[in-house]
Amino acid sequence: MDTLQNLRQSLRTLGKAPGFAILVVLTLALGIGANTTVFSIAQAIVMRSMNYPDSDRLMFLSRGYPGFPQGGGNFSYPAYRDILQQNRSFDDIAAFQEFGALALTDGAEPVRVNINYVTPTYLSLLGAQTSAGRLFRKQDDRWDDADPVIILSHGFCQREFANQNMIGRVIHLNQQAFTVIGITAASFRDAPGEIDSDAGEQIDAWIPLGLSNRLTGLISMSNRNGAILWGLGHVKPGLTLQAASADFASIGQRLSKAFPTTDAGFTFVATTLKTRLVGAFYKPLWLLIGASVFVLFICCANVANLLLARMVERERELAVRSALGAGVNRLIRELLTENLLLLGIAGILAALLVTWALKALGSWSRLNLPSVVHLQVDRWMLADCAFVCLIAILLFGVAPAITGASVDLRDAIGQSGRPGVSGRHRRASRALIVSEVSLALVLLVGTGLLLKSFRRMTTIDFGFNTDNLLTLRLDLNSNKYDQEDVRTQFTRNLRETLNGLPGVVSTTIWGPGMPGRETWVVNAVPEGKQPDDPRNVIMSTRHSVNPGALSEMGIPLLRGRDFTAQDDARAPLVAIISQSTAQAFWPGEDPLGKRFLPIGKRDWVSVVGLAADARLRQRLEMSDAAIGIAPGGLGPQLDVYLPYA
């Protein structure tokens, strides 16, 4: 009964000061909502384990290389076999290929299918379950012409085949027949397989790794230069992650000595799978957490100041009610009820704000969160919100209530006709203002530094013109385009078609690769240096482009000549190299006319041009902007750049 009476009294009191009530509610809602949103994101990314069994002991296996020792690079299939033979720290190691795509050719129009090529134990390492059929077995990973098999994801199966029973059915990818042996459970997500994918893309199907060479030609049982694999390893029980990482690194050291022409300068790096998937979010999240805490403190100070000012206005009212017989406990209960009511409304608004913010962030493709990370309102978020509300109640309800109810009545009545506040309230208000300004100043400085960093990121000089530029990706992983001359003719026809579109200034086809093989990174040795000496091996990224591509992209050609139509796959290999590449190959010398030999190749490459540095297909954090560019050898994955007027 007293509670209902206190609630009615609080509603009447707050109704007389709607501006005060709205301001307090909005301030609290924003403070609590912002903090709960940030901590919910941190919980989903940092605190919560990946949705895989024993995920804390799953390690991502990759290779580090000069200029990027922290790992993330690929290794070859022969290196994978060496890892299996020398492994002492993992009870299971699986390999998988970089993200790729094939075309489902059973319908009237081809359908893109995102593929992960994996070894047989890959899916079981991730705890995958099937809703129908089975997972891969060892005998499924065949390098011969045996009948190929495939496992479909639940989402892809529902999207393309509805509720049809697919087990045992034959589908065609790139006109190659595959027998469906399994369909994964609806909840399974292959986050490692999505590492090299575009934002929002998920794996649609899994194919045994042995079939990759037949379908893509990108992997070989014997070529140590064909670095296109990553690995997953489960650390043995009783062994620390640090010990497993050190043991894996030692394998890389031994291979570097055993194969100096292909593996020298490379390291093996093992990190937790979680770090590889979401480690890039850790630093920004800690910055956000710090900023949100400051925001909450500022909100607390604002609300405390509002409550103190409100209490000063009500001193005479409280004094009169106390003189009429209202006890101190009753006044405290009423004041607490008012504050609890304000906090309750603010908590509801904060929960709505958090729900909306998490949904918006979850659907924001540029955030590029792994598919195993789910931003959603759950019991942990609600617990965080309740905890923040509890702290707020203690700060804004109890202390002001005690202050207001224990006021000296004679002082209150004596001061009621004079402007100003009591000395105690004045000192408290000044302290709150000082703390609020201090916190705001720190937050302002941090925001300024963040904006400065953001501005630096948005003004990075990529070395080519990015204004009025459209890009698209073509994937020619199809038997129809498995011959290089067919791909070359296709790109020639594509350029003619696109150049005829209104507004298109030019069309640039940019593809990775040495002739006949797709690769982003190539080790090469300058002429006159011994290739078996690791110190002579220079790493460079290599691309295949059409004649005129440099000028079309705004990359200055400093010396030498551009490519011509005669620089095709039948002509001697020539290259235009960047300034950084020239400095690495021949410090202080003119590179024109000089030659270099890519490791694992027979044909020398002659330098015919020197171009300015540019960042193409490279990580922004990499300091090495060297790019080797060679004609011919267009791989199945092409980037198309369309400058427009």
Residue locations for each model-derived region?
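Alpha-helical transmembrane segments of integral membrane proteins
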Residues: 1-21, 273-278, 306-333, 337, ...
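Short, strongly hydrophobic transmembrane alpha-helices
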Residues: 17-45, 298-300, 344-348, 429-453
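Hydrophobic transmembrane alpha-helices
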Residues: 31, 290-300, 391-395, 441, ...
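Membrane-proximal extracellular/periplasmic loop immediately following the first transmembrane helix
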Residues: 42, 47-100, 225-232, 247, ...
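Acyl-group handling in specialized metabolite and lipid biosynthesis
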Residues: 66-71, 111-114, 234, 278-280, ...
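Mid-to-C-terminal secondary-structure elements
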Residues: 101, 115-139, 143, 147-286, ...
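N-terminal membrane-entry
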Residues: 278-295, 380-384
